[in-house]
């Protein structure tokens, strides 16, 4: 009886293990790459480039410290973009959990001005602190997120128009510690439509949007808010 009980329990564990492995494999190789259709709203408002949770919304000068991730460690827009920008900027950060859609979409229509890849300073750090804070809604959502300074990223500049004025926006795809690649589907000089897919990041990651601040801009999102790529209006 005892041997039969042990054998039955072992069989249960085997079946459970197979189901767990099958579920993980489906998530990792099928569900993760899902690409639901998106329908950009009418108008010319700047759209979210990513699905996820907004972790910061700031309007600052490029070299001015935007956020403090730890005591004595501050981050500016220039640190995130890895360029020396000028004039006041709007910065919106979006954390993408492993369960969000990971295809990234253009905030506006325009021409690809540049696509630049920057390797990690040493190695990619995990985004566990930010993930936990977004789950618990524990502000500030960016605290202890050293990946903002450290990690690999691809910076795509899109040159378009906003309210009939020229506008260049930067979309920054920041890799997480478990990321297996940042994909870019566009090249410099090509055109992209508002809400169209231009790339993706594999597994958990972050996408930031940087645009020049202009009079009359209205920020439509706040930290902690959920957004959808190609559909949620960030700025009007």
Locate predicted features.
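Contiguous, well-folded functional domains in the mature portion of proteins
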Residues: 1-236
């Amino acid at each position: 009886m005892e041997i039969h009980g042990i054998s039955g329990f072992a069989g249960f564990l085997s079946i459970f293990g197979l189901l767990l492995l099958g579920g993980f494999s489906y998530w990792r190789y099928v569900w993760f790459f899902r690409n639901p259709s998106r329908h950009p709203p009418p108008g010319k408002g700047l759209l979210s480039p990513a699905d996820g949770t907004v972790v910061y919304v700031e309007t600052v000068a490029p070299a001015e410290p935007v956020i403090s991730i730890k005591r004595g460690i501050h981050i500016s827009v220039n640190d995130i973009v890895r360029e020396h920008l000028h004039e006041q900027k709007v910065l919106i950060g979006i954390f993408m959990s492993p369960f969000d859609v990971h295809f990234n979409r253009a905030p506006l229509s325009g021409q690809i001005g540049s696509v630049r890849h920057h390797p990690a300073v040493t190695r990619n750090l995990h985004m566990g602190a930010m993930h936990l804070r977004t789950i618990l809604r524990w502000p500030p959502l960016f605290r202890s997120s050293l990946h903002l300074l450290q990690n690999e990223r691809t910076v795509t500049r899109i040159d378009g128009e906003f309210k009939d004025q020229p506008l260049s926006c930067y979309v920054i795809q920041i890799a997480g510690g478990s990321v297996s690649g940042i994909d870019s589907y566009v090249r410099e000089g090509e055109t992209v439509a508002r809400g169209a897919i231009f790339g993706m990041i594999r597994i958990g990651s972050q996408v930031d949007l940087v645009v020049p601040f202009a009079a009359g801009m209205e920020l439509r999102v706040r930290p902690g808010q959920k957004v959808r790529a190609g559909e949620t209006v960030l700025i009007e």
